[in-house]
Amino acid sequence: TVATILTILASTCMARNVLVNNEGLYAGQSLVVEQYTFIMQDDCNLVLYEYSTPIWASNTGVTGKNGCRAVMQADGNFVVYDVKGRAVWASNSRRGNGNYILVLQKDRNVVIYGSDIWSTGTYRKKVGGTVVMAMNGTVDGGSVVGPVTVNQNVTAVRKVAAAA
């Protein structure tokens, strides 16, 4: 397979598809990549859409409860909190404090990396995916082009071509 190394760019002019430690989505905010949207809806339901079709949901929707948030925690757990700050859903991926990144991938999957510890399970076969690694400035022995520093660790994103 042919792999192209990409960097994560946090830019207001680009749609984001990643959350790092302590970043989150509030009501109406989303991660977007191509036709996929991972959104914290106003009703407190966290939903992954392909175009306008829901693919996965946290099933935490409560009518009229604007004020929820989904947070990628520094312990590796991704948690939806209600308006009162109570956890109403979690990925159950807690691994202890470290550097984690949640990625909405082009293969329709949402994955938490530090190690591959949680995903929505919506991976689509024969579609290129995204692999995130942090290895002291290298990705599988290759050089990292324009790495991004996340909590003092170098993080790179590698786009993997689809298998034929």
UniProtKB/Swiss-Prot annotation:
Signal peptide residues on this chain, from the entry's feature table: 1-15
SMART domains cross-referenced by the UniProt entry: B_lectin
Post-translational modification: Not glycosylated.
Domain Bulb-type lectin: 16-125
Transmembrane segments: none
Alphabetized GO MF terms: carbohydrate binding
InterPro entries: Bulb-type_lectin_dom, Bulb-type_lectin_dom_sf
Presence of the UniProt keyword Transferase in the record: no
GO biological process: response to other organism
Keywords: Disulfide bond, Hemagglutinin, Lectin, Signal
Cystine crosslinks: C44-C68
Domain of life: Eukaryota
Chain's role: Mannose-specific lectin. Induces a Th1-type immune response in vitro. Causes a 4-fold increase in the proliferation of murine thymocytes and a significant increase in the production of nitric oxide at 24 hours in a macrophage cell line. Stimulates the production of the pro-inflammatory cytokines TNF and IL12 by rat peritoneal macrophages in a dose-dependent manner and of the cytokines IFNG and IL2 in murine thymocytes. Has hemagglutination activity towards rabbit erythrocytes.
Quaternary structure, from the entry: Homotetramer.
Annotated protein name in UniProt: Lectin
Species for this entry: Allium cepa (Onion)
